[in-house]
Curated annotation (Swiss-Prot):
GO terms for cellular component: cytoplasm. One of its GO terms (molecular function) is protein serine/threonine kinase activity. The lineage of its organism: Eukaryota, Amoebozoa, Evosea, Eumycetozoa, Dictyostelia. Its EC number is 2.7.11.1. Gene3D superfamilies: Phosphorylase Kinase, domain 1, Transferase(Phosphotransferase) domain 1. It comes from Dictyostelium discoideum (Social amoeba). It catalyses: L-seryl-[protein] + ATP = O-phospho-L-seryl-[protein] + ADP + H(+); L-threonyl-[protein] + ATP = O-phospho-L-threonyl-[protein] + ADP + H(+). PROSITE patterns: PROTEIN_KINASE_ATP, PROTEIN_KINASE_DOM. Keywords: ATP-binding, Kinase, Nucleotide-binding, Serine/threonine-protein kinase, Transferase. This is Probable serine/threonine-protein kinase kinY.
Length: 579
């Protein structure tokens, strides 16, 4: 029990998810200054400090003898993950320091240290849990969506590097309010797991994390993959939507196989929450792992939402790179303000210049017979010259206008001829369009024949595979059918993407209702999942065939042909689905 939250851990495979070495990450304790405590996490206390006069966060982890094995695994996992990742939405790792015992051993400093200090960048905006809980402060939907996207980007990065986080919760999301806009950052990788792709067969992964955000398959001790992080992500989204801890408002337990009831969750969602956002959260917490979206899809949806609900960049943050708008320097000779001042500050009328007493005295001292009358005469002469020039210009303009009129008459004659020629060309173009439409209809009909032929072959395949999968009665058989199971899941996903809008009537039954009479064995859960997936494939396949028959547009038919091609590639493959 850590900080009032249950954490479950089991033994793992040897050396899996552990670092090769952490020597390169060592820091000198002399350069590190420890300040006040700012929080606590699993296995340690977090302090604010400085390293080379820069603010840092220091997690000091005590080496408890009673939990030595768990501590070593926890610590090695965190250092291994942090050392090998770098992302703008993940807290940046700086280094590690092992505090030695009274008589340190040079053989293994980790085992013979009284505590270990993990140093990361300092994020001063608190964590997401605090922001959600403090209902007195405004938490605009724009910011919730922005932070959701930040988390999703971080998780997609981790999954691309074969890392399962396994403890994604609002307390592990720090808010960086020194950037503009505010940015979310994932932290605390003590339960993260680096997958070993060379390991074949069943994955005997450990059970760990905080049970209130854990996926059902993780709690039940079944095999799991990256989709457990997607479930936890959905819980975090729900907490941001409800501004409450999900475990306190939605009941989940053994009687429901630890499912979060979708209908109950939907009833709690406020009316002002965008439907696209709430639907995404509910999709992520679906009971069956294969029904949850991946982070690529999640990011796509959240980017759509951020375009609809953008976060406004503020300029009140002195640390923000966008805090000071670029303005021209006040002493710049080329600035619009300076140019305007220069032009408006001078009067070029000579009479105004000479009318001043100082200028007249200066002229007299130089024996210049320059009077105001002379100046007025000069000004009048200039005015007359300007008027004469204007008259000449007007005469030229009249002549030009006459020439333009003659040109217009000529253009009118040529336009009449062009209109006749265009009408002839239009008739030719219409004939060509008719031919093109006929060709497109023939192409569409050919595509229909080929697609329906492929779908007929697919029906035979899926009926055969479906019967075999539903006859599974032992856990060993599940492993033997692993390839076909993955094919079923991939086919369902492909079909779901193209006919989702036509399956609205079946959306209400997406999440299975469970009761205490259901056996929660691995085989029972597998059969229920497969039966549901197969039923969705059968329905989706029928809808797809109907669309193929009805579609007359060439572009839409080509899009459907791509879907059919994907389905064929999957069921004919020897399961290289990821390519």
């Amino acid at each position: 029990m850590i900080n009032g939250e249950q954490t479950m851990v089991e033994d793992e495979l040897p050396d899996q998810g552990k670092p090769m070495s952490d020597e390169s990450a060592d820091i000198d304790i002399k350069d590190l200054k420890v300040g006040e405590s700012i929080g606590s996490g699993a296995y340690g206390i977090v302090y604010r400090g400085t390293l080379f006069n820069s603010d840092v966060a220091i997690k000091k982890i005590q080496n408890e003898k009673s939990e030595k094995n768990e501590f070593i695994k926890y610590l090695k996992r965190e250092v291994a993950v942090l050392k090998n990742i770098q992302h703008p939405n993940i807290v940046q790792f700086i280094g590690v320091y092992y505090e030695p015992l009274a008589s340190p051993s040079l053989v293994n400093r980790l085992l013979n240290s009284s505590s270990t200090w993990i140093v990361t960048e300092y994020i001063g905006g608190g964590n997401l849990h605090e922001r959600i809980k403090d209902t007195k402060k405004d938490f605009p939907i724009e910011l919730r969506i922005k932070l959701s996207l930040d988390i999703a980007l971080a998780m997609a990065y981790l999954h691309s590097r074969d890392i399962i986080f396994r403890d994604l919760k609002s307390k592990n999301i720090l808010i960086d309010d020194s950037s503009s806009p505010i940015r979310g950052k994932v932290c605390d990788f003590g339960f993260a797991r680096i997958l070993n792709k060379k390991q074949q067969g069943n994955r005997h992964l450990s059970i760990c994390g905080t049970d209130s955000i854990m996926a059902p398959e993780l709690i039940l001790g079944m095999e799991y993959d990256e989709s457990v992080d997607i479930f936890s992500f959905g819980v975090v989204l729900l907490e941001m939507i409800l501004r409450k801890k999900v475990s306190k408002v939605l009941e989940r337990g053994p009687q429901s196989a630890f499912e979060i009831d979708q209908d109950s969750a939907r009833q709690l969602i406020p009316d002002d929450i965008p439907v696209l956002y709430s639907d995404l959260a509910l999709d992520c917490i679906k009971y069956q792992p294969e029904e949850r979206p991946n982070f690529s899809h999640i990011i796509h949806v959240l980017k759509q939402l951020t375009s609809l609900f953008p976060v406004v960049h503020t300029f009140d943050n002195p640390l923000s790179p966008t805090s000071s708008p670029i303005t021209p320097r006040k002493n710049s000779l080329n600035s619009p303000f300076t140019k305007s001042m220069r032009m408006n500050s001078f009067d070029f009328n000579l009479s105004n210049i000479v009318s001043s007493t100082s200028v007249q005295n200066n002229l007299k001292s130089q024996n210049l017979n320059f009077t105001l009358l002379n100046l007025n005469q000069i000004n009048n002469q200039d005015l007359n010259e300007n008027n004469n020039n204007n008259i000449s210009n007007n005469i030229n303009n009249i002549n030009n206008n006459n020439n333009n009129l003659n040109d217009c008459n000529s253009n009118l004659s040529s336009s009449t001829s062009t209109i006749y020629n265009d009408s002839q060309q239009t008739i030719i173009d219409e004939d060509e369009l008719d031919k093109e439409e006929e060709e497109n209809r023939n192409k569409v009909n050919n595509l229909k024949e080929k697609m329906l032929l492929v779908m007929g072959e697919f029906d035979i395949y899926i009926n055969k595979v479906g019967k075999e999968l539903l006859l599974v009665s032992e856990e060993d058989h599940i492993s033997q059918k692993y390839d076909e199971c993955r094919k079923v899941i991939e086919i369902k996903k492909v079909l779901g993407e193209v006919i989702e809008s036509d399956m609205s009537n079946s959306q209400q039954s997406n999440t299975p209702r469970k009761n205490s009479n259901v056996t929660n064995s691995r085989v029972a859960l597998f059969l229920k999942s497969m039966e549901r997936s197969l039923n969705e494939i059968y329905s989706s396949s029928d809808v797809l065939k109907q669309r193929i028959v009805k579609e007359d547009d060439l572009v839409e038919s080509l899009l459907l042909a791509r879907v059919v091609s994907k389905i064929k590639k999957i069921h004919l493959s020897s399961l290289d689905i990821n390519n």
